[in-house]
Structure formats: structure tokens, C-alpha cells
Design a protein with these regions (language model features):
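A short coil-to-beta-strand element that immediately follows conserved catalytic motifs
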Residues: 29-39
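Amphipathic alpha-helical segments that form well-ordered structural scaffolds
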Residues: 18-26
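Short helix-to-loop capping/linker segments positioned immediately adjacent to catalytic or ligand/cofactor-binding
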Residues: 29, 59-64, 130-131
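Catalytic core of non-heme Fe(II) oxygenases with the double-stranded beta-helix
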Residues: 47-113, 140, 151-161
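Conserved double-stranded beta-helix
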Residues: 101-120, 125, 130-224
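Short Ser/Thr-interspersed hydrophobic loop/turn segments at strand-loop and sheet-helix junctions
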Residues: 42, 80-81, 124-125
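A structural signal for short, well-ordered beta-strand segments
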Residues: 38-41, 74-76, 142-146
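Single conserved hydrophobic/aromatic residue that forms the stacking wall/gate
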Residues: 1-7, 11
Length: 224
């Protein structure tokens, strides 16, 4: 987790043009924008058992109407993905299934891919990490998921990437993380440094402007 504050190659993946075009196509019919939902690097080592098949939309329980697609998930291959070393199991077409339908083995595909490749699937598609049957080969992937900006993020981006870290990122990355407003006032903040209450419904991006905040010491994460 905490990849939003990690490295420049992660930023490039987060802002990848094609990924964001696909995310916009599938998500924006259900809202006026999307945000980074979850970041993680996952390594499946030799002998690891397969993950239970699941839908990522389950993070919000069963409260969202099925017709609403809340999530676009991506897995970037850092190492080669093979069926033998735990390539992700995916069930094509399962986004249209009844939620209780169980796939047969023949209906499960494996996302075998070379390093640098990326798997995309919506939050309604059944999937899960594969079993690593090798004795000396690990499978590593970077997970970057995007969700509608009116839903709570699975990873608390504002703790994983607090303002004193986010100030060094590009405005595009900050906006994707959630340092921005959705719709008219969703996600606004009250500036604790504005003693006169001059500004109302302030966009979080404003906190990175010098005329509002010059010192981020009050936002820094305390070390134990």
C-alpha cells in the first residue's frame, strides 16, 4: 500500500493515458469523476494457494445497485505472469452474471502476461490471485484501482499520502488521489489557517497554494 507517495514510475502508471480513458468510459456514466481507490504491490511466492474468486465491488457491501459500475481495477505485471506462478484468475463475462453463480473451471481464464503488461477489469468481474505451483518463482504485480469519486476509498489516501508528502506531487496526481472537489462541493475543506473565514467550500488543491498555506508542519504525520 502507500504507493501514491512511493516512486515516479508508479505515478506514470496512475496517469497512464489509456488506463484513464478506459476508466472514464466505464465510470463516468455513474458520476462526474473518479479517484484513486487502492494501491498495492502483491507478491505471490512459491507454494502459495489460490485466492477465492471475488468481486472488488464487495468492499462497499451489497448496497450499490448492480447497474452502477463503481470500480476499474488494474494489475501491472512487474514479473512475468504464468498460470504456474500464480497469474490472476479472471472469469470473462461474470459482470453480467447473477451474483450467486459459481464458475466452472472451464470458465476461468488466467492473465498470463509479460512484465510491463497490464490487466484491466471492472469491479463486477470475478477474479482472484492464482496458485503458485512453482518452487523457485515469485509473481509480483502492482495494483492500481480507480473508483467513483462519490464513494469512500478502500485505502485512506490522505493518511497514506498526507499533505506534507502530497505537496511534492504534481497537481494531476494530487487530484487523482482525492485532493480535489467532486461535483459542486463534495470533498471541500475548511482552511484552518484562514482565521477570517474568507474562503468557503475550498478545494483541497488550494492548500498547496502559497497564499493559503506556507508551512505544512501542522499537517505532518507524527512519528512514534
Amino acid at each position: 500500500h502507500r504507493l501514491s507517495s512511493a516512486a515516479s514510475d508508479v505515478y506514470k502508471r496512475q496517469l497512464h493515458k489509456k488506463i484513464n480513458e478506459v476508466s472514464k468510459k466505464y465510470l463516468e456514466p455513474h458520476g462526474d469523476g473518479y479517484q484513486l481507490h487502492f494501491t498495492s504491490a502483491v507478491c505471490i511466492g512459491p507454494g502459495e494457494s489460490k485466492q477465492i474468486l471475488h468481486r472488488d465491488r464487495g468492499i462497499w457491501g451489497g448496497y450499490l445497485p448492480r447497474k452502477v459500475e463503481p470500480l476499474m481495477s488494474t494489475i501491472w505485471a512487474i514479473t512475468e505472469f504464468t498460470k504456474a506462478n500464480g497469474a490472476t484468475q479472471v472469469v470473462p463475462g461474470s459482470h453480467k452474471w447473477d451474483k450467486d453463480r459459481i464458475p466452472t473451471e472451464k470458465e476461468i481464464a488466467y492473465a498470463e502476461m509479460k512484465p510491463g503488461s497490464v490487466l484491466l477489469y471492472t469491479g463486477t468481474v470475478l477474479h482472484g490471485g492464482g496458485q503458485n505451483e512453482t518452487i523457485d518463482e515469485s509473481r509480483t504485480g502492482v495494483f492500481l484501482h480507480y473508483a467513483l469519486n462519490w464513494l469512500r476509498q478502500e485505502e485512506n489516501q490522505y493518511l497514506s499520502c498526507p499533505p506534507d508528502v502530497a505537496k511534492d506531487l504534481s497537481p494531476e496526481i494530487r487530484s487523482l488521489i482525492g485532493y480535489s472537489k467532486g461535483g459542486y462541493v463534495l470533498g471541500f475543506y475548511s482552511d484552518p489557517h484562514d482565521k477570517t473565514a474568507t474562503y468557503e467550500s475550498v478545494s483541497p488543491e488550494n492548500m498547496f497554494k502559497d497564499h493559503l498555506i506556507d508551512d505544512f508542519s501542522s499537517y505532518q504525520t507524527q512519528q512514534n
